[in-house]
Swiss-Prot record:
Single GO molecular function: nitrilase activity
Domain CN hydrolase: 2-199
SUPFAM superfamilies given in the database record: Carbon-nitrogen hydrolase
Protein name in UniProt: Putative nitrilase-like protein NIT1
Species whose genome carries this gene: Saccharomyces cerevisiae (strain ATCC 204508 / S288c) (Baker's yeast)
Active-site residues (renumbered): 44, 135, 169
Family: Belongs to the carbon-nitrogen hydrolase superfamily. Nitrilase family.
Domain of life assignment: Eukaryota
PANTHER family: CN HYDROLASE DOMAIN-CONTAINING PROTEIN, NITRILASE
Gene3D superfamilies linked to this entry: Carbon-nitrogen hydrolase
Pfam family, one: CN_hydrolase
Length: 199
C-alpha cells in the first residue's frame, strides 16, 4: 500500500453560525493543498455545532419556552445533505475537496425534515459528495436533540488515500459497528469526535 498524508483539521464551530464555520473550514484551503493531505477529517458536529452544556430548556417533566426557542435556532443552523445546488454547504465542501485534491470527512448536524442527526459526510475530489454516516446511538442527553441513525448509512468509501469509513464519538466503542466496517474492507478509520477521551 502506498503512503499518503492524512490530516485532522482540529477546529471548533463558530457558535450559532454555520455560515461562519463553513468560511473557517474553507479558509484552510491553502494549508490543505500545501500539506499534500489526501484525506482531511473534521470533527463531529463542526457544521451546525455541538451544543455542549446546553439543556434546551428540558428538565425531567418540564419543557421551557426558552429551550424551544434555542432548539429552533439550532435547527435553523443544521444543514441538508445531498448533491447539487440545493445543498450549498455540501457544494462548497465539494469545491474545497476538488481544489485541494483531498477527500474530506466532515462532522455536521444534518436536518432531515424536523429531525436532526449527528452525521459525517464523505466528499471526494473527483466525485463530490459520495456518502454519509448518521450516528446510530446518540450518547446520553444527545438523544434529546438528535435522532438515531438506522444502520443504512455505514459506507466504506474508496479514496486516493485508501478505503475510508468510521464512526462518530462513542460509536467507536461499539464492537458490532466496527466489525461491520471491517467486513466492508475499511483501511483508514475516521473518528470525528468532540470527546477528548482516548478511543
Amino acid at each position: 500500500m502506498a503512503k499518503h498524508i492524512v490530516a485532522a483539521l482540529q477546529i471548533g464551530s463558530c457558535p450559532g453560525s454555520t455560515k461562519d464555520t463553513l468560511k473557517k473550514i474553507l479558509s484552510y484551503e491553502k494549508e490543505i493543498k500545501e500539506s499534500g493531505a489526501k484525506l482531511v477529517v473534521i470533527p463531529e458536529a463542526t457544521l451546525g455545532g455541538y451544543p455542549k452544556g446546553s439543556n434546551f430548556g428540558v428538565y425531567l417533566g418540564y419543557r421551557l419556552q426558552e429551550g424551544r426557542e434555542e432548539y429552533a435556532k439550532y435547527l435553523a443552523e443544521a444543514i441538508e445533505i445531498g448533491n447539487g445546488e440545493k445543498y450549498p454547504e455540501i457544494s462548497q465542501l465539494c469545491a474545497l475537496s476538488k481544489a485541494t485534491d483531498a477527500s474530506l470527512c466532515v462532522g455536521c448536524i444534518e436536518r432531515d425534515g424536523t429531525t436532526l442527526y449527528c452525521t459525517m459526510v464523505y466528499i471526494d475530489p473527483k466525485d463530490g459528495y459520495v456518502g454519509k454516516h448518521r450516528k446510530l446511538m446518540p450518547t446520553a442527553g444527545e438523544r434529546l436533540i438528535w435522532g438515531q441513525g438506522d444502520g443504512s448509512t455505514l459506507p466504506v468509501v474508496d479514496t486516493a488515500a485508501g478505503k475510508i469509513g468510521g464512526a462518530i464519538c462513542w460509536e467507536n466503542m461499539m464492537p458490532l459497528l466496527r466489525y461491520a466496517m471491517y467486513k466492508k474492507g475499511v483501511e483508514i478509520w475516521c473518528a470525528p469526535t468532540v470527546d477528548a477521551r482516548p478511543i
